[in-house]
Amino acid sequence: MGLFGMMKFAQTHHLVKRRGLRAPEGYFTPIAVDLWNVMYTLVVKYQRRYPSYDREAITLHCLCSMLRVFTQKSLFPIFVTDRGVECTEPVVFGAKAILARTTAQCRTDEEASDVDASPPPSPITDSRPSFAFSNMRRRGHAFAPGDRGTRAAGPGPAAPSGAPSKPALRLAHLFCIRVLRALGYAYINSGQLEADDACANLYHTNTVAYVHTTDTDLLLMGCDIVLDISTGYIPTIHCRDLLQYFKMSYPQFLALFVRCHTDLHPNNTYASVEDVLRECHWTAPSRSQARRAARRERANSRSLESMPTLTAAPVGLETRISWTEILAQQIAGEDDYEEDPPLQPPDVAGGPRDGARSSSSEILTPPELVQVPNAQRVAEHRGYVAGRRRHVIHDAPEALDWLPDPMTIAELVEHRYVKYVISLISPKERGPWTLLKRLPIYQDLRDEDLARSIVTRHITAPDIADRFLAQLWAHAPPPAFYKDVLAKFWDE
């Protein structure tokens, strides 16, 4: 899943940055967690180490490890589920649904040109309660003002714990969801949305700072992603780093790399990131340009470089944008600046040389040894929040100007998906206000008796169950109320 070749490209071109993600003292950093994606990655990693564990045992082992790291790093997870909290919802929105609906409507490319390019409106598009939201509210209750939560649902009848994508995968998804709810963690019931789309909604409504996933299609939706939280410095990819490296605006990025989305192009018909860039005759920045970019990033990591103004192609001259010409115009004159002197390496013992101000985002020593004044962390945090509020993606609809009129099934699928992404992340104008509706967040009351009942019911070996329960009580303390966490992180 994701953009084919994007992860390899990001690693090769040093776009995977390692950051501490340490918020000021007393703050929790909210992070959306694509639960299936993250747990899948952990289970694949650990199931060979513990061949005697069944699905529930290996799932709980991975869950305990993940929750312990969240606690250690002061991260506040908001878990996003696939197919609802009971794993029974049909997914009717998103990339896979758009592909299925389009291929059912059009059997040949000739039919595609006569079909409406608009996808069905997502639940976020309409301001009225949708069918998907109605389902969410029937299964759980959103917090009323002053309410601290609702009692989690009981274990219920014995039900399968979610179908694994491969027979060899030992991931009990429904079991994982029930344990998290019993422990009182915040979650999103994505209902008929894909988890990726719900994560993007949380990011663009300034609910979370990052999305924890390895799916690079979140980058196509303009999000910053965290790949792994278990390391000292957390590997992240920022969408704006990609835009600066490619020297293009977000609408260009969305229109160009939608061709690489694996869920939209079956039977290996997608293009790779390298193929798309090669067709555009894109060239990587020179070393001097990379050094200047690194210097600008360190000087002011909160400022976003203004994107170049582009002129639309004349009407009637061509139906597909000439990306070669556009990118050639954008990189023209980049080498007119004089060569920068090599950057001095930082002083490992004392920080940057020449008395430069130390930044908590710079990687100098292991994070547990970095001593940064809390006042500096607060100032950097406020700058980050101000930057996120200032750099809302308002120009996403311009991506449609860079797409050709759909003449084939593939182009129709891409056109519909781009429109769908725009409906997810672009705020709507309502008089003097710009609004983007956020999916409701739920947080059940913590019930340790219920959690113990769920664990002992599915893990029949008493010694294994007791060991995991002891880990949960030790490393997964009662989480804070999500509204308090979000208010402190974004508003103080």
UniProtKB/Swiss-Prot annotation:
Site-annotated residues for Necessary for the endonuclease activity: D215
Primary role: Minor structural protein that acts as an endoribonuclease during lytic infection. Degrades host mRNAs in the cytoplasm by cutting them at preferred sites, including some in regions of translation initiation. Together with inhibition of host splicing by ICP27, contributes to an overall decrease in host protein synthesis. Also, after the onset of viral transcription, accelerates the turnover of viral mRNA, thereby facilitating the sequential expression of different classes of viral genes.
EC number: 3.1.27.-
Residue segments, region Disordered: 110-130, 143-165, 288-307, 334-369
InterPro entries xrefs: PIN-like_dom_sf (IPR029060), XPG-I_dom (IPR006086)
Any Gene Ontology biological process: symbiont-mediated suppression of host innate immune response
Assigned keywords, A-Z: Decay of host mRNAs by virus, Endonuclease, Eukaryotic host gene expression shutoff by virus, Host gene expression shutoff by virus, Host mRNA suppression by virus, Host-virus interaction, Hydrolase, Inhibition of host innate immune response by virus, Interferon antiviral system evasion, Late protein, Nuclease, RNA-binding, Viral immunoevasion, Virion
Sequence similarity: Belongs to the herpesviridae VHS protein family.
Top-level taxon of the source organism: Viruses
Subcellular location as annotated: Virion
A single GO molecular function term of this UniProt record: RNA binding
Predominant subcellular localization, coarse grouping: virion
Enzyme category, top tier: hydrolase
Protein name: Virion host shutoff protein
Xref: Pfam families: XPG_I (PF00867)
Positions with biased composition (Low complexity): 144-165
Family annotation (Gene3D superfamilies): 5'-nuclease
Any one GO CC term of the record: virion component
Record's subunit section: Interacts with human EIF4H, EIF4A1 and EIF4A2; interaction with eIF4AI and EIF4A2 presumably allows Vhs protein to associate with the eIF4F cap-binding complex.
Naturally occurring in which organism (per UniProt): Human herpesvirus 2 (strain HG52) (HHV-2)
